[in-house]
Amino acid sequence: MIKARITVTLKNGVLDPQGKAIEHALAGMHFSGVGSVRQGKVFDIELSGTDRAAAEADLKAMCDRLLANTVIENYAVEIA
């Protein structure tokens, strides 16, 4: 079995209203020193099999086709 983590984040320059709302909420809760906040998504996926190259190709295809909007989001695939 192969375990992977996919992290999806907005590309630089793309507005992040949810991140901005979190940033303002943290300031309102008196957390000092918080600069910019960007929000993203994390997916933990388990795949059957042991072929890491095939797993990486499948995971990237999952991102390109469903998990990430590649017009406005970047993704990173980590295989454990």
Regions found by a protein language model. Give the residues of each.
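Long, contiguous binding/interaction regions
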Residues: 1-80
